[in-house]
């Protein structure tokens, strides 16, 4: 992280650029949470801080709005922003200097579980649409409804099995987090963060296929759901990071 905040009297002076500042394009957005380096000589997990920055502060600039799969996600929006000698009161510091990583880690476990819950919900919607399309009497090919064609029976069955597996894994991770905390539940949380979005993506893709061209149009929510779930494989850590965490946990069981 290159963005910095330097204490100058009673104010922090902030400099840096930020990509994917979610919500910055919304006219209702009035304040930003800025994570930056305040203590570069501290141990690596104690170098960063979070500071509140009002949007109208001098030196805050939206460079461009970012597109996701070709969409600008207006009015919510994700911004590329630049901060040039932005001054804010030192009271805008959250929790304390060097505690930004601590704040971030505190929400990552619950946040990842929440992501997975939404992924399971998206999968359920896609499966429902797939089934309804499959038995629609107005959608017939070769004298049969669509569910009876190709491998659609298998796709429907696999989707239910995978959804249930994702749900039970997520419930297990949530229960463990509630009883023993984020750190002890880290492997279970990492597992679901990989599994649930990938399951949702597969089911949405199957639903798109049975809908044909309609599946990628504005007539169903499937295309936007697919884009959202694909970004979820990057949000709060990409799949590869979580797989690495799971593998390290498993290997650790057998290392002295």
Can you annotate each of these PLM segments?
Residues 19-20, 26-27, 38-41, 56-58, ...:
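Short, glycine-/Ser/Thr-/acidic-enriched flexible segments
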Residues 10-11, 15-63:
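A short core secondary-structure module
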Residues 2-4:
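Beta-sandwich/jelly-roll carbohydrate-recognition scaffolds of carbohydrate-active enzymes
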Residues 62, 92-97:
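Cytochrome P450 core scaffold surrounding the K-helix E-X-X-R motif
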Residues 24-28, 43, 70-75, 108-118:
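Short alpha-helix boundary/capping segments
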Residues 7-12, 80-85, 99, 106-256:
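Alpha-helical interface subdomain recognition
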């Amino acid at each position: 992280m290159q963005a910095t905040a330097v204490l100058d009297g009673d104010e922090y002076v902030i400099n840096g650029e930020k990509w994917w500042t979610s919500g910055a394009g919304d006219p209702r957005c009035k304040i930003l949470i800025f994570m930056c380096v305040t203590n570069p000589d501290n141990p690596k997990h104690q170098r960063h801080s979070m500071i509140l920055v009002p949007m109208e502060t001098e030196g805050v600039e939206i460079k461009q709005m970012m597109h996701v799969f070709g969409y600008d996600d207006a009015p919510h929006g994700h911004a590329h922003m630049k901060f040039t000698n932005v001054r804010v009161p030192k009271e805008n510091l959250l929790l304390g200097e060097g505690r930004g990583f601590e704040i971030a880690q505190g929400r990552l476990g619950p946040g990842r579980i929440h992501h997975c819950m939404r992924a399971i919900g998206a999968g359920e919607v896609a499966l429902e649409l797939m089934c309804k399309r499959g038995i629609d009497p107005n959608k017939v090919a070769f004298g049969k409804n669509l569910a009876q064609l190709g491998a659609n029976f298998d796709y429907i069955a696999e989707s239910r099995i995978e959804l249930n597996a994702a749900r039970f894994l997520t419930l297990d991770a949530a229960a463990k987090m509630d009883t023993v905390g984020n750190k002890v539940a880290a492997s279970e949380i990492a597992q679901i963060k990989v599994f649930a979005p990938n399951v949702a993506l597969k089911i949405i893709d199957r639903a798109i296929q049975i809908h044909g061209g309609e599946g990628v149009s504005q007539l169903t929510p499937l295309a936007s759901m697919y884009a959202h779930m694909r970004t979820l494989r990057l949000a709060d850590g990409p799949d590869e990071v979580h797989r690495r965490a799971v593998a390290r946990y498993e290997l650790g069981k057998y290392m002295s």
